[in-house]
């Protein structure tokens, strides 16, 4: 019986059985499985790319937006990069089995905490076949089984990728059911996964705000929400006094907005100190040269128009919007306090301050309640690879169970280990 003919509950039962095996696997065997997956992806390049070509053709026939088709498309180079990423995960430190120093309590019992896998993950995502492999690799290395539900646009690609992964696992005598893909793209199957709380330990959605909202509103399984949120940069006056700092600000803001505008850690709103407005034209000129549409409040709009630059008048809706495109809003503030109030109302993902005042920097770090807070660095660094985690399954913007990029450690939890010699509680 293939995963194509199994019910979602069947997948859950098989995943739970596989998870019992995975949680005890030594690091070397998990790493060997990932290297086997990397080899199998390369060996099946023709099959995988042919399946992907069918998905791309169907997407183009359905007139899906160009950016969705681009996310969907694989070629030999991108598949090789995916395989390399899997091999790289195998080199990461394995958090499973880490143990806190043992304490001996007055009762004589010895107490410690040990890091263990979450168990079974359900990951729901859209038109990115690379996520299928990336998430499978992270789940396996952290000792978790995973049930994957991709978008309908990736049905053929995901089936081919799942085949490669499962064949590699079988070659290493690891349960194939550690990685399973829901083949039926119907929303009813997603609902079944969201409500499989007796078998699935956590749901991790990867996609837009609509997908996250649907999961939160319909799941009985705990949902880890992430990847959505408004990104702010506050440009303090102190960072505009030195021409070299102005050049740094222009470069950093360009990187934050232009490098990958569809990313969740791309800039959405620039907050600028009113006394820093004289440098705004230099920033705006650079952004518009790279195709960015600007929406500004009255003081910023006046500064731009006086400099002969095009911009639109911002509306209230432009603040608090995650654009995921070459659009940014600009808001003038009287100082740090107003910037902090604004971010408190609109932020929770990644927020940046550009300042030469260490007191203001520390206040910003202390007061801003976001998954990542940065001083004089691009928000694009809020990424698992960039923060030294090696890879990530998602970027969580909630406070439980994890916050920020979710690497291997964030896919684990802890259990108490108590050792005694017949002690009883008095």
UniProtKB/Swiss-Prot annotation:
One term of GO molecular function: NADP binding
Known catalytic reactions: L-glutamate 5-semialdehyde + phosphate + NADP(+) = L-glutamyl 5-phosphate + NADPH + H(+)
Pfam families, per the entry: Aldedh
Keyword Cytoplasm carried by entry: yes
Gene Ontology CC terms, in alphabetical order: cytoplasm
Gene Ontology biological-process annotations: L-proline biosynthetic process
Organism domain of life: Bacteria
Keywords: Amino-acid biosynthesis, Cytoplasm, NADP, Oxidoreductase, Proline biosynthesis
Keyword Glycoprotein: no
SUPFAM superfamilies referenced in this protein's UniProt entry, alphabetically: ALDH-like (SSF53720)
InterPro entries, per the entry: Ald_DH/histidinol_DH (IPR016161), Ald_DH_C (IPR016163), Ald_DH_N (IPR016162), Aldehyde_DH_dom (IPR015590), Glu-5-SA_DH (IPR012134), GPR_dom (IPR000965)
Chief place of localization: cytoplasm
Function as written in the Swiss-Prot or TrEMBL entry: Catalyzes the NADPH-dependent reduction of L-glutamate 5-phosphate into L-glutamate 5-semialdehyde and phosphate. The product spontaneously undergoes cyclization to form 1-pyrroline-5-carboxylate.
Family: Belongs to the gamma-glutamyl phosphate reductase family.
Protein name: Gamma-glutamyl phosphate reductase
Species, as recorded: Deinococcus geothermalis (strain DSM 11300 / CIP 105573 / AG-3a)
């Amino acid at each position: 019986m293939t995963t194509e003919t199994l019910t979602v509950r069947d997948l859950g039962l098989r995943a739970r059985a596989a998870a019992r095996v995975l949680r005890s696997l030594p690091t070397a065997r998990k790493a060997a499985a990932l290297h086997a997956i990397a080899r199998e992806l390369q060996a099946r390049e023709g099959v995988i790319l042919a399946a992907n070509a069918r998905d791309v053709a169907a997407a183009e026939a359905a007139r899906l937006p160009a950016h969705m088709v681009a996310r969907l498309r694989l070629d030999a180079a991108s598949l090789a990069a995916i395989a390399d990423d899997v091999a790289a995960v195998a080199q990461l430190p394995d958090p499973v089995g880490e143990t806190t120093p043992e304490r001996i309590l007055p009762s004589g019992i010895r107490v410690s905490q040990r890091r263990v896998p979450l168990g079974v993950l359900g990951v729901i995502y859209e038109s990115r076949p690379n996520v299928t492999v990336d998430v499978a690799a992270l789940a396996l290395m952290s000792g978790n089984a995973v049930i994957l539900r991709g978008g309908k646009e990736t049905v053929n690609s995901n089936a081919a990728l799942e085949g490669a992964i499962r064949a590699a696992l079988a070659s290493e005598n690891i349960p194939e059911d550690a990685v399973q893909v829901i083949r039926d793209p119907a929303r009813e199957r997603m609902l079944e996964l969201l409500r499989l709380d007796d078998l699935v330990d956590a749901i991790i959605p990867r996609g837009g705000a609509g997908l996250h909202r649907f999961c939160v509103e319909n799941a009985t399984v705990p949902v880890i929400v992430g990847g959505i949120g408004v990104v702010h940069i506050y440009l303090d006056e102190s960072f505009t006094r030195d021409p070299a700092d102005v050049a740094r600000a222009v470069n950093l803001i360009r990187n934050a907005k232009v490098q990958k505008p569809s990313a969740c850690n791309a800039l959405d709103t620039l907050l600028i100190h009113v006394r820093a407005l004289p440098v705004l034209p230099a920033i705006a000129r650079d952004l518009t040269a790279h195709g960015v549409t600007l929406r500004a409040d009255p003081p910023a709009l006046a500064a731009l128009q006086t400099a002969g630059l095009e911009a639109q008048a911002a509306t209230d809706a432009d603040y608090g919007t995650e654009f995921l495109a070459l659009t940014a809003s600009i808001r003038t503030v009287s100082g740090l306090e107003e910037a902090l109030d604004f971010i408190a109302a609109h932020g929770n993902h990644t927020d940046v301050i550009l300042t030469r005042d260490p007191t203001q920097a520390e206040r910003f770090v202390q007061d801003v309640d976001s998954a990542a807070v940065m001083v004089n660095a691009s928000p694009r660094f809020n990424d698992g690879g960039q923060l030294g985690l090696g890879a990530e399954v998602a970027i969580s913007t909630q406070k439980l169970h994890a916050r920020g990029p979710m690497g291997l450690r964030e896919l684990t939890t802890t259990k108490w280990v108590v050792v005694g010699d017949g002690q009883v509680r008095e």
